[in-house]
Amino acid sequence: MPEYTGRPSEGEGISLFMPAFNEEQNVAFMIGCARNALDALGVPWEIVIVDDGSSDGTVRETMAATVGDERIRVVSHGANRGFGMALRTGIESARMPWVFYTDCDGQFDLDDLGRVWAERVDADVVSAYRRRRRDPGLRLVYSFCYNLIAWIVFFGGFKDVDCSFKLYRRSIFEKVKPRSTCGVIDLEILTLARGFGFRRRQIPVLHRERRAGTVSFETFRKGFFAWVRIGALTEMLEQLFALRVRTWRGDVG
């Protein structure tokens, strides 16, 4: 096993982080997939699981899956703080020159990480888009509307903006300072990175049905709005508006 110093790596290297909220059925499987994908890259790596206040055995399962490997660690929120805050914590916790994030629900094939990694040569941000989404109908409708709003309000250029399969050069976050606490954070990072002139590539990736468990970020399970809370929708719209005002004013720091 490579020696792990806990210090930022020089040159090539990648931090892979996964936000997790009540993912006890998936987290060990995803850590195993991540290990295999990262080993295939042939560079130093680390894995960070960002536990967003899980009430199940997510942390326990993570610790059991990572015994003896100091390259894998858990960063925990004391309470559920939302998807945007989980991403911000993951970015802040990353120690390697490249930062990659994906979901912890098994909907993405981490074998595609190699293709994303290859695109970094000509890019500072590699943003994937789902070739064929395997999500419930209402979620597809919501995502279509969200992407359409993002396209109109922020003048296009982004395909499948909320796809959780992205690679960033860590140094871009010396300038790009995300403030969003919800899912708007993906759009915020891409918009600010574009404003600073960072290079971006987009590639298609496979998408699958959720491996186990239920949708957990910003959801509830019953009623007409079967997967999105009204409060979460309001928060998203407010933060979209705030981001548009922020970019219009040039407040990008």
Question: What do the predicted segments below correspond to?
Answer:
Residues 1-13, 155-156, 178-253:
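Hydrophobic helical membrane-anchoring modules
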Residues 1-36, 43:
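N-proximal low-complexity "stem/linker" segments adjacent to membrane-targeting elements
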Residues 71, 75-93, 98-101, 107-183, ...:
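Acceptor/aglycone-binding surface of glycosyltransferases and processive sugar-polymer synthases
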